[in-house]
């Protein structure tokens, strides 16, 4: 694991029990994303519908704020994955507190998810891409573990750089400086078919499907 990944994991582990939900989820997400939280929860309900009882992945799981709601809406297994051990620990506590017996959590690198190809009929990536280094390998992994015919649901907050900058340095910019359309293009390059793309203030919500061929 790279130094930057270890640093990010440590920062979010520190935040898990202290201020992640009050400041980030209920503060920043609402300030910059408007109704983003409600829309992300709605995406979770769609994921539960399309999974039809099959397993669902939510990466990154964070403190399970969104994931535990997904687990309540789903009859099958929900797996939360996060690079931050503190987030995983907090998520397991939340699962126990909320009696979400179908929620399991694992610590894992977004670039090397510990699941076989075509595992999940629905994959969630809720409000996390903007802080994960390496958009292309992250999306590639999410696409890999999505089952053929399955769906990837993404919500992400970004502060896009000017178009000229993005066009000139797109491969070098962090995800938070890309536009929703830039992220959608990466998803399409991973082999998924874009179904919907919508904006909510500085947030983008994307739904994509993995072809069955």
Predicted regions and their residues:
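Conserved class I S-adenosyl-L-methionine
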Residues: 1-51, 65-69, 153-177, 201
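Short alpha-helix
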Residues: 175-190
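A short SAM/SAH-binding and catalytic strip from SAM-dependent methyltransferases
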Residues: 122-134
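A short glycine-rich, Lys/Arg-flanked "PGG" loop and its adjoining helix->strand segment in the class I
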Residues: 136-148
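A short acidic, Gly/Pro-enriched loop at the edge of an enzyme's catalytic core
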Residues: 111-123
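Core SAM-dependent methyltransferase catalytic element
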Residues: 192-213
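Class I SAM-dependent methyltransferase SAM/SAH-binding core
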Residues: 55-112
């Amino acid at each position: 694991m790279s130094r930057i990944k270890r640093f990010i994991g440590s920062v979010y582990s520190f935040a898990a029990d202290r201020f992640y939900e009050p400041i980030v989820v209920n503060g920043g997400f609402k300030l910059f994303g408007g109704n983003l939280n409600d829309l992300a929860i709605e995406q979770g309900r769609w994921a539960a519908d399309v999974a039809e009882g099959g397993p669902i992945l939510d990466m990154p799981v964070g403190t399970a704020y969104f994931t535990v709601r997904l687990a309540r809406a789903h009859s099958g297994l929900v797996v939360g994955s996060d690079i931050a051990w503190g987030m995983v620990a907090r998520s397991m506590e939340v699962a126990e507190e909320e009696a979400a017996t179908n929620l399991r959590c694992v610590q894992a690198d977004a670039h090397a998810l510990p699941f076989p190809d075509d595992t999940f009929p629905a994959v969630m990536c809720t409000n996390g891409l903007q802080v994960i280094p390496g958009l292309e390998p992250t999306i590639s992994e999410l696409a890999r573990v999505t089952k053929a015919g399955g769906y990837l649901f993404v919500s992400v907050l970004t502060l896009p750089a000017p178009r000229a900058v993005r066009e000139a340095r797109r491969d070098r910019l962090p995800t938070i400086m890309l536009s929703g359309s830039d992220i959608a293009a990466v998803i399409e390059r991973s082999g998924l078919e874009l179904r919907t793309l919508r904006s909510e203030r500085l947030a983008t919500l994307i739904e994509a499907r993995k072809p069955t061929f």
